Amino acid sequence: MKVRASVKKLCRNCKIIRRDGVVRVICSTEPRHKQRQG
């Protein structure tokens, strides 16, 4: 899980979602692409 000021999709399978007011990126194919805005 990377914590970044600006989260971006890193591949075509990344999805940007908003959970409890926090923007996150989840990725099914590459778990290293997981990010959280912070």
UniProtKB/Swiss-Prot annotation:
Keywords: Ribonucleoprotein, Ribosomal protein. Pfam families: Ribosomal_L36 (PF00444). GO terms for biological process: translation. The keyword Chloroplast does not apply. InterPro entries: Ribosomal_bL36, Ribosomal_bL36_sp. GO terms for molecular function: structural constituent of ribosome. SUPFAM superfamilies: Ribosomal protein L36 (SSF57840). It comes from the Bacteria. One of its GO terms (cellular component) is ribonucleoprotein complex. Belongs to the bacterial ribosomal protein bL36 family. This is Large ribosomal subunit protein bL36.
